[in-house]
Curated annotation (Swiss-Prot):
Record keywords, A-Z: Endoplasmic reticulum, Glycoprotein, Glycosyltransferase, Lipid metabolism, Membrane, Signal, Transferase, Transmembrane, Transmembrane helix
Gene this chain is encoded by: UGT1A8
Cellular compartment(s): Endoplasmic reticulum membrane
Sites carrying sugar chains: N71, N292, N344
Domain of life: Eukaryota
Name listed for the protein in its UniProt record: UDP-glucuronosyltransferase 1A8
Cystines in this chain: none
Organism of this sequence: Homo sapiens
Topology class, membrane: Single-pass membrane protein
Enzyme Commission designation: 2.4.1.17
Length: 530
């Protein structure tokens, strides 16, 4: 018998999905961050363009990657620095990581990174000095701003034009995420950045965690001083970091609880960890040939990210020596000077299709700096890691993966050739590392919505509703003592003390009355006996 109606929900779901595909077109302003930050943000922007939205990207004329191959309106503005200045400051910053690992905000403040960050911060002043561009943005009637908060310029733009904003970030430095979202972060089990602690901290680590929290309040204002001065100049009023971050409508955070430790979250914090992962593509013939030639031993993928172009000669030779002692073929993304002791099993390449190689069944291990992009590609493809973190959240990412048994962490500044060799043999030959990373991969992929689709939904949500005020906690409207209920505690303490005082006075009065009466009785009794 022919069916006269839909008895299955599948056609209805397909119909709804198709209907959702035709979103009501909006107008979005994008203020991105250069470098690797742009790679994943670009995927969201491209999908929003495909869904029919009018997207305008505002970027400096001097940049590495911004705005390339985008089918949308790109508005540029001149900067006070050249590409050579940018490259020089970045190289100084990158080279400094091979001298000492930054594990406190005080050492970061004293390091050479200040010049690099201040260069990035300065371009926002250039944006607002372009009066023609500012006038264009003012007249464009955008629905929202999609921004990377690293250099604060997107936050300044959102506040200047009074637009709802969607923040796109792995995490936020200092205490700005907790303050901006009014999200609690108990220091007893939520480790601060740079420390590389797990959520099961010893007493000594908890003490250090509290000290780091104090450091954030002491030194972050100095670290962000240049950005806040520019913001105050543009907005023509004194501005704090809280003033900028607290108006965020939605926080799109490139993490999840497969990588991160469980902790409190707020309703406007959306987790899109793994958004950079994608289905593996066929490998270029060159790399397919390398894999075929590797035989049964397979390959090891080695990349320290775009940040590292040169490794000190002595360290590079120690690494090359270790790589030559394993039977696998090593594909090493490296643009520096070729180590003189490079073994036949190690192939240097200037670029490699990292995600596609990690997705190949012959890949045995991944040597990485533990940047969030690489870590998630490793999780998605189920490849155990040897992690050599250098800076920022890399130490924290590495600790999280090591805690979960998915890899081994080495101190790249102190490790020897034997350390790297032993770590590689451990993650390749010990099946527990592969089993653990496959378990994490299964957990990560078991989700109702893909991270990219989730990110696109929330950007469109903010565009449709002009923000998300219903998700904004009332904590933003409280003073610090109200937030911590110090006024309530003080009131209740006063009540308890008042009651205790009155009770004490009543008891003392009764006691005196009783003693006085008893004394008179005794006195009367004595007089009668005489």
């Amino acid at each position: 018998m022919a069916r006269t109606g839909w008895t299955s929900p599948i056609p209805l779901c397909v119909s709804l999905l198709l209907t959702c595909g035709f979103a009501e077109a909006g107008k979005l302003l994008v203020v991105p961050m250069d470098g690797s930050h742009w790679f994943t943000m670009q995927s969201v922007v491209e999908k929003l363009i495909l869904r029919g939205h009018e997207v305008v990207v505002v970027m400096p004329e001097v940049s590495w990657q911004l705005g390339k191959s985008l089918n949308c309106t790109v508005k540029t503005y001149s900067t006070s620095y050249t590409l050579e200045d940018l490259d020089r400051e970045f190289m100084d910053f990158a080279d400094a990581q091979w001298k000492a690992q930054v594990r406190s905000l005080f050492s970061l403040f004293l390091s050479s990174s200040n010049g690099f960050f201040n260069l990035f911060f300065s371009h926002c002043r250039s944006l607002f000095n372009d009066r023609k561009l500012v006038e264009y943005l003012k007249e464009s009637s955008f629905d929202a701003v999609f921004l990377d908060p690293f250099d604060a310029c997107g936050l300044i733009v959102a506040k200047y034009f009074s637009l709802p904003s969607v923040v796109f970030a792995r995490g936020i430095a200092c205490h700005y995420l907790e303050e901006g979202a009014q999200c609690p972060a108990p220091l007893s089990y939520v480790p601060r950045i740079l420390l590389g602690f797990s959520d099961a901290m010893t007493f000594k680590e908890r003490v250090r965690n509290h000290i780091m929290h104090l450091e954030e309040h002491l030194f972050c204002q100095y670290f962000s001083k240049n950005a806040l001065e520019i913001a105050s100049e543009i907005l023509q009023t004194p501005v704090t970091a809280y003033d900028l971050y607290s108006h965020t409508s939605i926080w799109l955070l490139r993490t999840d609880f497969v990588l991160d430790y469980p902790k409190p979250v707020m309703p406007n914090m959306i987790f899109i960890g793994g958004i950079n992962c994608h289905q593996g593509k066929p490998l270029p013939m060159e790399f397919e040939a390398y894999i075929n030639a590797s035989g049964e031993h397979g390959i090891v993928v080695f990349s320290l990210g775009s940040m590292v172009s040169e490794i000190p000669e002595k360290k590079a030779m120690a690494i090359a020596d270790a790589l030559g002692k394993i039977p696998q073929t090593v594909l090493w993304r490296y643009t520096g000077t070729r180590p003189s002791n490079l073994a036949n099993n190690t192939i240097l390449v200037k670029w490699l299709p990292q995600n596609d190689l990690l997705g190949h069944p012959m890949t045995r291990a991944f040597i990485t700096h533990a940047g969030s992009h690489g870590v998630y590609e490793s999780i998605c493809n189920g490849v155990p890691m040897v992690m050599m973190p250098l800076f920022g959240d890399q130490m924290d990412n590495a600790k999280r993966m090591e805690t979960k048994g998915a890899g081994v962490t080495l101190n790249v500044l102190e490790m020897t050739s034997e350390d790297l060799e032993n770590a590689l043999k451990a993650v390749i030959n010990d099946k527990s590392y592969k089993e653990n990373i496959m378990r994490l991969s299964s957990l990560h992929k078991d989700r109702p919505v893909e991270p990219l689709d989730l990110a696109v939904f929330w950007v469109e949500f903010v565009m449709r509703h002009k923000g998300a005020p219903h998700l904004r906690p009332a904590a933003h409207d409280l003073t610090w003592y109200q937030y911590h209920s110090l006024d309530v505690i003080g009131f209740l303490l006063a009540v308890v003390l008042t009651v205790a005082f009155i009770t004490f006075k009543c008891c003392a009065y009764g006691y005196r009355k009783c003693l006085g009466k008893k004394g008179r009785v005794k006195k009367a009794h004595k007089s009668k006996t005489h």
